[in-house]
Amino acid sequence: QLSANDMLRPGDWIELDQLGANGAVQDIGLTTVKVLNFDNTITTIPTYTLVSGAFKNWRYMIEHDARRIQRSINIDIKTVHFLGEDEKKAIISQPELALLRDGELNVGTNVELFQQYTNEYFRQHDDVCQHMTLMVRQLQPTVYGLPVEFYLFTSLTEWVSYEQFQTEIFSHILSVVSLFNL
């Protein structure tokens, strides 16, 4: 049933947390499926568990070269304020923020300007999937501040490249956030 419904193929990366499976399918037998986990252990899963329950299959992500990034940073709420024209001009005149000079700036606060900048930064990045959802948004404030979430997809699906890309973009974001007086 797994093969007939194309639920699983050898080589698929699957996750089944309750059984400790997180790796590549090695073998699909009549009664068991063997998964080589990323820590080089083998998990043997009864096929009925996969047919009757839920598991995560990462095949679609790999086939379509699109892996989601969904992370947030917290902004100190006390630093969020309305922007006067002079402050707005001073912010966008900084060399690191050149991306803001070409667009229309219909924002009232420094956090909105920061969101506009990061959105434009992602729109101009070659490794961001432009045909998929790309969003910079504010989440519900917490005791830790105002979470600004970055939701996007990258064409880098291989684990090490994916993690390096996240390091690159979040290092950039964290280095420019103070330029917005946040």
Where are these regions (language model features)?
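Membrane-bilayer interface helices and TM-boundary transition segments
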Residues: 1-36, 41-44, 51
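Structured, soluble regulatory/oligomerization domains located on the cytosolic or IMS-facing side
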Residues: 35-182
